[in-house]
Amino acid sequence: MARLTAEFGDRIYYNQVMDRGAMRQLIGRLIIYLGSNCTSQILDQLKTLGFRHATQAGISLGVDDLITTPSKTWLIRDAEYQAYTSEEQYRRGSIHAVEKLRHVVETWHTTSEYLKREMTSHFRITDPLNPVHIMSFSGARGNVSQVHQLVGMRGLMANPQGNIIDLPIQSNLREGLSLTEYIISCYGARKGVVDTAVRTADAGYLTRRLVEVVQHVVIRNPDCETNQGIRLHSIRDRKTTRDAGGNSLLSLQERLIGRVLARNVFLGKRCIAIKNQDLAPDLVNSLVNFPKALLSPGSEGGHCEILVRSPLTCKSMPRACQKCYGWDLSCGNLVEIGAAIGIVAGQSIGEPGTQLTLRTFHTGGVFTGGVAEHVRAPFNGIVHFSISSSTHKTKTIQPTRNRHGRPAWTCPEAFSVIIEDRIGKKKVLNVPQYSLLLVKNHQYVQSRQIIAEVRASIAPLKEKIEKNIYSHLQGEVFYNPIGLRASCLKQRHFLHFLCSASRMNLWIEFASIRSYLSPLVEKTSYIWIFSGRLNKFFNATLNLSFFYQTQDYIQRDLPIGIQNHVFNYSKVFLLSIYNRQRSVTFSVSRRDIRLGRKKKFTDYIPLSRISTDKIFSKHTGSIHTISEQNEWILTLSFVDQFSKKMFSSVQTPGTSKVSEKSEEQIIDFQEQLILNYPLSKTTIFLKEPSILAKNYSIAEKDSCIGLLGEFFIFLNELSIVSVRTFISTSQINLFLKKNVFSLLCITHGNTFKGKEKIFFINDSKNIYNIKNWLISVNFLIWCHFSNRILNKNQTLATIFLSNRSLRNEKDLQVKEFKIGQSICPSRDLGEKIFEPFTHSILPESGHLLSLNEGNLLIRLAKLYLIPTGGIAHTFHKQTINEGDTLVTLAYERLKASDIIQGLPKAEQLLEARVGNQVVINLYMRFEILVARIKEQLRNYIGSLTQMDLMLSQISVNRASKALEYSQLETVDQVQKVYLSQGVYISDKHFEVIVRQMSSKIAIVENTDFTAFSPKAVIRTAFPYDVLGVFFPGEILDISKAQKMNRVLYKPLPCKPVLLGITQASLNANSFLSEASFERTITVLSRSALQGRMDWLKGLKENVLLSKMIPAGTGLKQAPVLLSPNGTGTLFSNNEQNIFQKKNVTSLSKSKGQKVQIRKIFSFQKSPQRLSFLYQETSSSNIRRKIQPTVCLCKPFITKRNWLHISLKQLTEQSLNYETKKFCLQELTNNFIPRKKENIFYLKKKTIKTT
């Protein structure tokens, strides 16, 4: 022992578990410090050592090692109870089908994930050396999901379409599956086989498209000498409100390794890293871990972000340079010149998708993902809590309706919940901010009951789909009155109010009025009523105000006010017809009701938005009058019967469609309330898109309309009316043309059947004894009400007093059966109306037809709840068959998070499809933020004033920032898709792809409003423009546009485009590359008509023609041109004829051998096409190679040994379209303008000879 201690005493000993991550770090450091040869030998020895120890250890796996978690029993029981509760609520009509499906899926998903966490902790505590636990958590074989299926529960399965089956598999593979569970589990096996076959082809096609778009990108030069760069940051999970930062998926250190600095980094006044220095791991750790305060503002200005060079900012378009690309990740050094980085980038992104498609076979198609956490009660007790902020202003919880259709409350901030049992034991539970509270204060809860739902730290993947609800019966459709509708339209903080006995405006100014429009469904939603104060104008007298207190919470089924007035309408009904409006003749019977002594009431009649579901007449009539004898009189004009096509199209608010020669008129309701313009065929109605949400169903029986949500029951009288409604407060906001039409309608939120048959049998006047307990249906609370008398200047204040809970006394409810009412199934009819029905259970839901002393006649029915936004496909009293579509619901559902759903998301990002929400946001930001992209494309050369230079520099900086943001956001989004699967791909590969996607601009017309017109355009001295060179819609490279704008008087009208990888491949500079990719016939036909030429600069074009590819050793340096007479000029010609034959020589230096290249330009008079001969002669080789190629001419004029060209002469030449384009491109590539002269001078190129 002493010998061993002496031998190894001076060596460092590491005690660390060598898992997958540690091995990756070890191999990386070995390659950097020792090289690949030594690393391979060391890894071979490690492999031998691992096999020997694995043989000696002899870990085995048996059936007894599969231990089931004890908490599975009560978790399954709780999930089954919640699923049963959702099914019962769906049968009663309390929730709709989407809420039921969502609740069942999320309940089982939450149970499965919770059981997985319990399984992990159970293994760690009871048996940490369990072979199953060791194998799965060491990374040797298996993962947590597979072990969970063995000893936990298989959970929810996903079908081949990725949809989640709502029937879970409760058993695990250790216990064995039932027949139904086995059939469902076969979905997963089939899904794995199908994905292996089909999805692999999809991933391979993605690789082909990626390689196609960047196959020509090659490292061409060492440095492009750019001063631009990008700032990187760590990539985190999807952010939520509770966890603003999220978990780090990719650290900043990993993203910086192998990059090159674009700017010096200073620590104080000392430079610690210089520009163009590559970042090794040690230097990256030092830079990132420096405190922010020590970094000088000149470098990174208090940021942790380092400015590094990137292919996105490289000036060597369309190639790249060594400095901007950085390290070759295979060797840890700068990439070599000639490396085909485009091919490497395409394969690096596409190949992991091909390999990851095999993962679904091993997981068996089991659905996994992040879930919301629950705060449960530890024992039985009473809940106590209070919410208050640090600013001593009480923040009340806001009532809402959760995703499962149950009442909940949103918590504005984090707070504590105290649970106290009978003996005084207390437990404090912390509820995070913006959680959903599912219990009320001072409520009794049971053990393990869910108190609050905490939002998931990682938002699960969701998708928006539509679900059709089909009829389970054959029969007739009846729509209950479409709920309550409370709306308050904010318009200049005023509401139009029609005063009584006069046609003038009385305005109600609100101190705090909010825009609010929410359809309310009975027993499932809530209403807010706002308060305000009255301002009197024109000495108008108004004694009472029907406005409640600010934000008083009012439950749906509670009585709100009692008044003694009933209006009996006879034969009032409405037929809703799409695109046609039919009105019928009806009459209104008046009934004068005395309201009290010396009191005046005003009916609240707001202005209603005109839509097609209202009753229109040819002329508007009187609306509302009140006499002076303290009586209430309601009058309506008679409506003649007519049927006319009112409008031809449904338009959104703010637009109008009119006939020709019509002038726009705006109705000012403050000056004139009633306009008697007749209707005509050209009248267009301003219609909101949601048609079905505004259809008010009016029954064909005698109806009564109540005011402002009243609930009153008259006993021992001939009429018993129950009215619970609120009056709509929407307003007219019209912009009509030509024939202006206005209508003020008396609108109501709901109508109720008020015949004498309510609570009567065959018009009998006997009334049965009805208990007068008024109980809320929503929360089952005994409530006693005390109503204050309305004085002159007081607002109505209804006080709600709750005494005790009725949790165990659910049978004592309001006797609310009446003729024509729909009854939910499984309701106890005991002590409802008649004694013979005591303790009778209704087996099925139905429609109550008649009440007799001995029996009830119920028509079998099925209840369906339609939420907001649902699209109904049937009408009231329509006969349908079984299986017909009733309604279509749009909702979000969870989506499986494997690579099968990840690859389509990455493909949507790379293809820049508009259907993807992320791409929409990026594209909108790309167009909005790059509002002045034209300044970036233009190189300002000429006489600049100081102000012009400052303005142009600001525009260029702004456009550059916007373009950089859009590119980096796309890179991060695609990176997150692969990081979610545990695959890290270097950022530089994504940047090469994204650069090609965003390197194009589209030519637009000058009259296009999307074209960019910079404020500080630098005008050159040329008065001529090159017209007809580019057509609108033509795609150009940004680099070409930059060069063209140098010689144009007016910059090209263009806008940036974000092309997908397929479109970018089809808009390449090589028609051979385009034709060999897709749409061969289309590309070749278009190229032949345009006379395109291929310069064979990419890899694919040379491979097609069996030439040496311009990469690696086949990359040639660009030749340096010299003049034949050695005077430093390329051409020396004093003749004015631009079409002539001229021999030009140039010199190239390659591999130490001087090769003389002779280019012969053969010009003809006014040619359309020219022949181009390329002769290569060598001093060491007498052979000559002559290769004919088709190209176009370069027209030029020489004068005084300087080459210049007149744009006027170019535009007047009889050249075709492609020739003009070529001439313009070649001019901008070789010439620069001289200040204040109509001459373009040649770029002088010198060569150093030894």
UniProtKB/Swiss-Prot annotation:
In plastids the minimal PEP RNA polymerase catalytic core is composed of four subunits: alpha, beta, beta', and beta''. When a (nuclear-encoded) sigma factor is associated with the core the holoenzyme is formed, which can initiate transcription. GO terms for molecular function: DNA binding; DNA-directed RNA polymerase activity; zinc ion binding. Its cofactor is Zn(2+). It is found in: Plastid, Chloroplast. InterPro entries: DNA-dir_RpoC2_beta_pp, RNA_pol_Rpb1_3_sf, RNA_pol_Rpb1_4, RNA_pol_Rpb1_5, Rpb1_funnel_sf. This is DNA-directed RNA polymerase subunit beta''. Its main location: plastid. Belongs to the RNA polymerase beta' chain family. RpoC2 subfamily.
